Amino acid sequence: QKELVTHVYHTICHSRKLFIEAPTGAGKTISTVFPAVKAVGEGKADRIFYLTAKTIARTVADRTFDLLRERGLHFKTVVLTARDKICFMEESECNPDSCPYAKGHFDRINDAIFELMTTKEHYSREEIEACAQKYKVCPFELGLDMSLFSDGILCDYNYVFDPNVKLKRYFDQGEPGQGYLFLVDEAHNLVPRAREMYSASL
């Protein structure tokens, strides 16, 4: 693990790419997250994107940040959940006429953001849903807004690589990915996903 941590840190310092292949249980998550967090703390990067194809991998990464926080780390992270999974309505129609959470959303969103910012460092799906229910705001939009105040964003590949879904607030301004670290979990899964993203169907 020590050797892996060193390689990851040097890769970040020299703005390079690193591919890691190691067996399950080798400690890849902590060995990549720790040097990335260190680099952000030293001002070598602004934000970490931890990208996964599966929810379980996101959960493991989430727990890794929690372990570091238990040992004194102050680092805000948000877990982004797909709109159709986190929406409170049976059918997600994002307009004020059909969704009570969309109606008046912008009147209440600042209070919701302020509460999370001042009371939490970990914005999990459960925390976001609870706060969204309390202030009656859209949980999906609340998660996206909390990402602006987070040092680490845990999300699906789509939010970075899919041209239709990518987070435009980060990737449509200036040089793409400037100041960001991308930790891509199980990168072999990205190939078939990328094919889907860039394939059209009639």
Question: Predicted segments — roles?
Answer:
Residues Q1-V8, V33-A36, G143:
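Generic hydrophobic alpha-helical segments
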Residues R16-I20, D46-I48, G152-C155, Y180-F182:
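Generic beta-sheet signal
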Residues Y9-H10, T29-G43, T64-L68:
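Walker A/P-loop NTP-binding motif
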Residues H14-F34:
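Walker A/P-loop
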Residues T32, T59, R63, Y135-G152, ...:
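Signature of the SF2 helicase/ATPase Hel1-core->accessory helical subdomain module
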Residues I20-G27, T52, I56, Y198:
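Alpha-helix capping and helix-loop boundary segments enriched in small/acidic/polar residues
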Residues Q1-E21:
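Conserved pre-motif I regulatory segment
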Residues K44-I153, N158-F161:
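A substrate-engagement module of RecA-like helicase motors
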